Amino acid sequence: MKKILNFIVEINLAIIISLFTSDFILWFAIILLLILAWHHINEYRLLKYLNLKQDNKFSLLQLGTFSQTEAYHRHQIYKEKCASLRLLSQINKNIKYLPDAIIICQHNGNISWCNSIAPQMFDFCWDKKVQENIFDVIFYEQFKHYFFSPKKRRPLVLLTYNQRYIEVQSHAYNSHMILVIARDITDMIHLLNSRQKFLSNINHELRTPLTVLQGYLEILADNNIQNPLQKKAIXAMQEQSQRMEHLLQQFNFLAKIETTSDKDFRKFDMSAMINSLRKDTDILNTYNHHIEFIIQPNIIIFGNESQLRSAVSNLIYNAIKHSGKQCHIQIQWETCEQGIKFNVIDNGVGISPQHIPHLTERFYRVDESRSHLTGGSGLGLAIVKHTLLQYHSHLNIESTETKGSSFSFIIPKRFVISKNNKEIQ
C-alpha cells in the first residue's frame, strides 16, 4: 500500500513538472522513464544485497527485477508459513502423546481442541465438527468454581465416579482461550495413603510396648537400687525410651502435617508465642550460649499455632544443641518487605556446603555421633519444611564452616493480620 501511494505521488509530480514545459507528453514520458529507471536501480541494489542472482550474467540492464523482488518477498512469506506449520505440527504431535490430558477451550467452556488422552480420561467423544462444552465433560461442580475462580494457587484434585484421582490445572492460554491440563494421580494418592497407614500402624505398635517398658523402668528406678552399675543402666534405658517416645511424637506430628487437609488456621499473637519459648531455651541451654531475642511485638498471624510453635522451637533447639559451645545465638522476628521474617543466627561450628541441600530430608544427620549425643532425631527440619509449605514459604539455610549458620523463613503478608484485624497489604 505504501509503495502504491509513493508511486501515485511520483506520477502527480511528473504531471506537475510537465505542465510547465512546451511539450507535455514528451516531458511526461521522459520523467516517467527516469522514475522507472530509478526504481529499477533500487530494486537491483536490493536484489544484489539479498544475493538472489542465480548466475553471473545477470546485470542491471536485465528486465524482470520487479517480479524477482516480489517473488522473493512472497517466497519469504511462504517459508515463514511453512516453518510455522512445521512447528505447530511438531508441537501438536508431541502434545498428542503426552500422558496428561490437554484441553483448549473458550471462556464459556466450548472446547476448541484436545489431545487423545482427554477423551480417554473423561470418557467422552470429541469431534471438531460437533460442539462440546467442558462442563459437560468435567461435570463436577467444584471444577466449575475452580475454572471461573480468578485466584488459582493450587491445582484442583477431583475424585471421579470410577474412583480415580484427577489433578486439574487451568491457565489463560490467550485473551480468548483457556488451557486445561489434567493428570491422573491415583497411583500417587494410593502410595501416600499406604505410607500413611504404614506409619500409623508403626506408631501404634511401638507406642504400646514402649509405654509398658517405661512403666517398668519407673518401678525399677523407685526401688532405691544401690548398685551404681544397675542405676546407670536404668537411667540410660529411661533416657533412650524417652528419646524413642519423642521420636514417635515427631513422626506422628509430621504425618499429620503431610496428610491433613484441614489447616485449622486461626488468629494468634506469634510474637507472644516466640517470647514464651524463652524459658524453654534457658532449660535447654546446657552449653552456656548467649541467647538474644529480638522480637517485634504484637504481630498477629493467621495460621496454625501448634505447628508454627513446633517449627520455631525446632530451629531454636537445633541452634542450641548443634552450634557448639558458648556461642552467640540471635533469634529475630521482624517485618520485612515480603511479610514477617523469622531468623535464627549463630556463630558456631557451621555446616559443610554438601550437607545443606539435604538438611530438610527425614532422618538426615550431619554428624551421626553428635546427633546421638544431643538426642537429635533428624525429623525437626523436615517438620519445619512441611509446615512452611502451608504458608507458601520455604526454609532458607545459609552456613559457613567455623563461622556460623542462619536458618530463616518468611510468613507472606496475606497471613499477617494488622491491629485493625485486616490483612497487611
UniProtKB/Swiss-Prot annotation:
Residues 201-415 form the Histidine kinase domain. The modification Phosphohistidine is found at H204. The keyword Transmembrane helix applies. Pfam families: HATPase_c, HisKA. Its main location: membrane. One of its GO terms (cellular component) is plasma membrane. Gene3D superfamilies: 1.10.287.130, Histidine kinase-like ATPase, C-terminal domain (3.30.565.10). It is a single-pass membrane protein. It catalyses: ATP + protein L-histidine = ADP + protein N-phospho-L-histidine. SUPFAM superfamilies: ATPase domain of HSP90 chaperone/DNA topoisomerase II/histidine kinase, Homodimeric domain of signal transducing histidine kinase, PYP-like sensor domain (PAS domain). Its EC number is 2.7.13.3. The chain crosses the membrane at residues 15-35. The keyword Transferase applies. One of its GO terms (biological process) is cellular response to phosphate starvation. It is an enzyme of class 2 (transferase). Residues 89-156 form the PAS domain. Member of the two-component regulatory system PhoR/PhoB involved in the phosphate regulon genes expression. PhoR may function as a membrane-associated protein kinase that phosphorylates PhoB in response to environmental signals. NCBIfam families: phoR_proteo. This is Phosphate regulon sensor protein PhoR. It comes from Haemophilus influenzae (strain ATCC 51907 / DSM 11121 / KW20 / Rd).
